[in-house]
Curated annotation (Swiss-Prot):
Classification lineage: Eukaryota, Sar, Stramenopiles, Oomycota, Peronosporales
Keywords recorded for this protein, A-Z: Host cytoplasm, Host nucleus, Secreted, Signal, Virulence
Region span, Disordered: 54-75
Protein's name according to its UniProt entry: Secreted RxLR effector protein RXLR-C02
Cellular compartments annotated: Secreted; Host cytoplasm; Host nucleus
GO cellular component, one term: extracellular region
Disulfides per UniProt: none
Length: 92
């Protein structure tokens, strides 16, 4: 009887605090939202990296095209490239 009373008190306190008897069920939509945000960020970064390599003439043509230093995406790509070269990774 005491255990039953403890369980009912815990559920009542949880409901009063959160508006739901099982507050952990609210986590599932947040996980889906987080996964969507991560996938969106990854797709954005991959698209940006591909654009940078195309703009710099590394994909599809042999011309030596240059990008001004004011272009933040070009700066980001150059930083990525120098970091990889410094630590010994082979660049595409």
């Amino acid at each position: 009887m005491q255990f039953h009373l403890l369980v009912m008190t815990t559920i009542a306190a949880s409901f009063a605090a959160t508006g739901s008897a099982l507050p952990h069920t609210n986590v599932l939509p947040k996980i889906g939202t987080l996964r969507g945000a991560i996938n969106n960020d990854a797709a954005t970064f991959n698209g940006r990296a591909l654009r940078n390599t195309e703009n710099r003439g590394l994909i599809g043509d042999d011309s030596d095209s240059s990008i001004s230093d004011s272009d933040s995406e070009a700066k980001e790509y150059r930083a990525y490239k120098s970091h990889k070269e410094h630590f010994g990774y082979q660049m595409p």
